[in-house]
Amino acid sequence: MIVLGIETSCDETAVAVLENEKILSSVVSSQIDVHKKFGGVVPEIAARHHLSNLPVVFKNALSQAKISLNDIDLISVTYGPGLIGALLVGISFAKGLSLKLNKPLIGINHIVGHVYANYLTYPNLKPPFIVLMVSGGHTEILHIQNEKIEVLGKTLDDAAGEAFDKVARILGLGYPGGPEIEKIAQYGNDKAFNFPKPLYDSKDYNFSFSGLKTAVLYTIKKLDKIPKEDVAASFQRAVTDILLHKTFKAAKDKKINTVVLAGGVAANKYLRTKALEISKKEGIILLIPPIEFCTDNAAMIAIAGYKLFDGTSDLNIDAMPNLNL
């Protein structure tokens, strides 16, 4: 089966082609440089760029995959969560293709796509497993059983990625904040500041990062000279400690031997390294996708569509910016 994946939920325009589980092409056009001067994604600008970028990205994806339009068997598109204008661009394009080619259409939850991205690297992955889903807009611990996804815990305020962006702004760094903090943190002392770890010792699996962000702000206000590298490193350590403590706690509590990372923040090398250290210590299998499958891409939407397609087409898909699992 040839599956076309389309992803336009935020500021990446992405199209991928899969033959069953094999990637034939995966093309991503990023808008980071467009939004950098605004310090974050501007929804209207994002939608307009998707409109102009999507036809080009689509053409490149087909060309790289060496297929024609008529070779497509299934169209898989993100329908939420995300920016409504951005989502509508991808959905409208996918619906038009579905009608023109008379090929089935399936809508995919963006978060589910991040989970299924792991199947691109680990095709033999079998439930049950625990997922740390951590991105700019979402931070959740998920329990995967067969095709059922149970949310064990989630952030009660800021997502981890949001906290990175906000602390980066406090430090006067660029956008996106996560990579900027990671970049300077490698030159800092991660024990220079003992920032709080909200909910670290709570019995549940929920997160809270707004207090940590505020603690960073108050700490900086008290300093005459801001050691940015040390602040970034200490903040990164605090976030990582919280995320991994809760994730591996969930795995042990549920007696599950496999932990999977997913989402854009899972591209953070410090997080990946610490997760590997803990997994070895605890004797738990850790699976981490390559960085290109952590950040937004359409291959994850295509693989999710391939695995979840039940033979029925859904042309009634609508953009759901606040879609939950």
Curated annotation (Swiss-Prot):
Matches recorded under InterPro entries: ATPase_NBD, Gcp-like_dom, KAE1/TsaD, Peptidase_M22_CS, TsaD
**GO CC terms:** cytoplasm
User: Where is this chain primarily localised?
Assistant: cytoplasm
SUPFAM superfamilies linked: Actin-like ATPase domain
Per the record, what are the reactions this protein catalyses? L-threonylcarbamoyladenylate + adenosine(37) in tRNA = N(6)-L-threonylcarbamoyladenosine(37) in tRNA + AMP + H(+)
Report the PROSITE patterns cross-referenced here. Answer: GLYCOPROTEASE
The cofactor note reads: Binds 1 Fe(2+) ion per subunit.
One GO biological process this protein is involved in is: tRNA threonylcarbamoyladenosine modification
Cofactors: Fe(2+)
Q: Which family does it belong to?
A: Belongs to the KAE1 / TsaD family.
What's the protein name? Answer: tRNA N6-adenosine threonylcarbamoyltransferase
